[in-house]
Every structure is written in structure tokens, then in C-alpha cells.
Curated annotation (Swiss-Prot):
Subcellular localization: Cytoplasm
InterPro entries registered for this protein in UniProt: Atg3/Atg10
Region feature Handle region, mapped onto this chain: 242-319
Similarity comment: Belongs to the ATG3 family.
Region (Disordered), start-end ranges: 135-170
Keywords: Autophagy, Cytoplasm, Protein transport, Transport, Ubl conjugation pathway
GO molecular function, one term: Atg8-family ligase activity
GO biological process: autophagosome assembly; autophagy of mitochondrion; glycophagy; piecemeal microautophagy of the nucleus; protein targeting to membrane; protein transport
Chain segments carrying region Flexible region: 85-167
Subunit structure: Monomer. Interacts with ATG8 through an intermediate thioester bond through the C-terminal Gly of ATG8. Also interacts with the 40 amino acid C-terminal region of the E1-like ATG7 enzyme. Also interacts with the ATG12-ATG5 conjugate.
Source organism: Chaetomium globosum (strain ATCC 6205 / CBS 148.51 / DSM 1962 / NBRC 6347 / NRRL 1970) (Soil fungus)
Signal peptide: none
Name of protein: Autophagy-related protein 3
Main location: cytoplasm
Length: 338
């Protein structure tokens, strides 16, 4: 069933005509031109990301420039698998985080990390002597009696196992962001590698995906810009536009509230919920000056948005950064350029 869906999905993206009419503010969807603008912004702010061409001209898509077919970042570390021990109780519990009070907005899924239901408790450390007698609680050995691990030598007869179990060991990932004409949103693909540099067997990449998303939000599919068939873990973009629309609306509402408070001479919190998010996004100016680039007459992104109404939006289309929360074990590089 997954093979049929993947084939149909690839054909839809390959043959669906790209729309060049912007509906970003109303739907959260973007055009190919806006995808390129957002990609340029991502590459500018985060140097670990780069544009890349398809491996062969036959794999190129006509709605994107040849040298900007997709975005890629390589050698992204992933040190732990998402097993039962990852992040405490991650994978055991989940909760839907609702929208604001009296809000009709949908919430989002938060998996794991519910410390209130599984509080961590410190356990007493107790010792056992050679006769098998358990020491009383609170008994503390003399520090001089505690063996120094640095003085212990490894037994030459012991074979050291570097794997440390079935689900451990560091991996690296290459992350790819493409444009989907069918969904009119970005789409992410991931290709994993073993510590020795060999590509992971496709199903092993699912060990780094949150359980509820496996084979639903994330499936194994061929990367469309490679000359040969290479299976990657692909994050479906079907809910990306609605989620972005909700984020845009909330950020705009926070910006409006912030301006109303400033106009009334009231103190504005520096990091309060979505209002704090809006403030941080505004600081992501291409010029790096920390000012609202929509007000800068020399802003190199002026060709993306010209309307005066842009001064009343918290997130511009070129700041449309792709967000993925289904891979918490993959350590994305958020180092920003200056």
C-alpha cells in the first residue's frame, strides 16, 4: 500500500502545474518563487544549508531554477534512537496542546516529556558487603575506600563492543527540502548513514521517528532528484500549510497586541508566548541589524513583498522556515551567519 501511495504521490508532484499566485497570508501555501526566496533566506542565515541541482537534467523541475532545485544540509548528528529510554518518558505519553482560551484554532501534538505524570524520584544509594548484608540508609563510605576507576585497568581478555546494543550508536543524516506543487508547501526528506559512512537500511531510519508518525506522517520514498532509486524517510506536507496558517495568524495577533500596548504606553513583555515569538522573528532581518526589514528601504528582500500592509505582519514569506518536530533525536544546526 505504501508503494502505491508513494508512486501516486511522486506522479502528482511531478506533473501538477505549479501555481504562481501567492496565497501565503490566506492559506499558508507558497509559490515556487516564494520557496526560492525562503530558501535564499535559510541559506543566508544558516550556512549549513545550501542549494543544489538535480543529479541529471532529466530530474529537474521546470518551476525552479536549475541551480536551486532543492535545499540540503549534510552530516547532521543523531546520537540516540527513539527507544523507551529517550528523553525520559518520551513515547509513553502524549498530549494535545490546545489553542488559546476561547480560540477555535486546532492544537498540536506534544509527545513525551510529561514529567507531571511520571515524576523523577531520587533513589537511595545503598551498599552490600561481602557477606551480602545491606547497609543502613544514610551510611556513607569513606571516600578513601571508594576505588578509583582511573586506576582500574581493562582486562585484555574482554572484547570491547562499540555498538553498545541494537538501538545505539551515532548516526548522521542528510536533510533535503524540496517544493511540492501538489501541496504548495516545502517537503522534507531524510537520508541516514551509519558511523562508517554507509547508508542506513531504509527501515532503520524509522528508529529516529516518533512512533505515532511512522508510516503515517513519515513514509519511505525515493528522493525525486537523484538519478537512481534511493529510499529516504519523507515527511508528508499535507498538514504543513494549515499549521503555518495558524502560526501566522497567532503571530500577527501578537504583533497587533504588541503595537496596541506600545501605543498606549504600556510595558511590553520581551518573551511572552507568541508575542515573544513575534519579537524574535522580527529580529531575523537579512541585514542582521535586528530591525524590522519591512521598514528598511534598502532591504534586499523588497522584491518579495511590496505592500505597505507588510508592516502589520509578524512573519514575512521569506521567513517561512521549515519546522520539523517528528525527529527530536536529530540535532539540527541552528548556527546563524553574521
Amino acid at each position: 500500500m505504501n508503494i502505491i501511495y508513494s508512486t501516486v504521490n511522486s506522479l502528482r508532484d511531478r506533473y501538477t502545474p505549479a501555481s504562481h499566485t501567492s496565497t501565503f497570508r490566506n492559506t499558508g501555501e507558497i509559490t515556487p518563487e516564494e520557496f526560492v526566496a525562503a530558501g535564499d533566506y535559510l541559506v543566508f542565515k544558516f550556512p549549513s544549508w545550501t542549494w543544489s541541482d538535480a543529479e541529471t537534467p532529466a530530474k529537474r523541475v521546470a518551476h525552479l531554477p536549475p541551480e536551486k532545485q532543492y535545499l540540503v544540509t549534510r552530516n547532521v548528528p543523531c546520537h540516540r534512537r527513539l527507544n523507551d529510554d529517550f528523553a525520559g518518558d518520551a513515547g509513553h505519553e502524549e498530549a494535545v496542546v490546545e489553542g488559546g482560551k476561547n480560540s477555535g484554532d486546532d492544537g498540536w501534538l506534544r509527545t513525551g516529556g510529561l514529567a507531571s505524570s511520571q515524576p523523577l524520584k531520587a533513589r537511595d544509594v545503598r551498599t552490600v558487603d561481602d557477606a551480602g548484608n545491606v547497609a543502613d540508609r544514610g551510611a556513607i563510605d569513606d571516600e578513601d575506600d571508594i576505588p578509583d576507576m582511573e586506576e582500574e585497568e581493562d582486562d585484555e581478555a574482554i572484547i570491547q563492543d562499540g555498538s553498545h546494543g541494537k538501538h545505539s550508536g551515532s548516526r548522521t543524516y542528510s536533510l533535503y527540502i524540496t517544493y511540492s506543487p501538489w501541496y504548495k508547501t516545502p517537503r522534507m526528506y531524510m537520508l541516514g548513514y551509519q558511523p562508517n559512512g554507509q547508508a542506513l537500511i531504509p527501515h532503520l531510519m524509522m528508529e529516529d521517528i516518533v512512533g505515532d508518525y511512522k508510516d503515517k506522517t513519515v513514509t519511505l520514498e525515493d528522493f525525486p532528484f537523484f538519478a537512481t532509486s534511493v529510499k529516504t524517510a519523507s515527511i508528508h506536507p499535507c498538514k504543513h500549510a494549515p499549521v503555518m496558517k495558524t502560526l501566522l495568524d497567532r503571530a500577527d495577533a501578537a504583533l497587533k497586541l504588541r503595537k496596541e500596548r506600545q501605543k498606549a504606553g504600556l510595558e511590553v513583555g520581551s518573551n511572552q508566548g507568541l508575542e515573544g515569538l513575534e519579537a524574535q522573528v522580527v529580529k531575523l532581518a537579512v541585514s542582521g541589524t535586528g530591525t524590522d526589514v519591512a521598514n528598511d528601504a534598502n532591504d534586499e528582500w523588497e522584491e518579495v513583498q511590496h505592500d505597505a500592509a507588510d508592516q502589520d505582519v509578524a512573519i514575512r514569506v521569506d521567513q517561512y522556515l521549515f519546522i520539523a518536530s517528528v525527529t527530536p533525536g536529530i540535532e539540527h544546526d541552528f548556527t546563524m551567519g553574521v
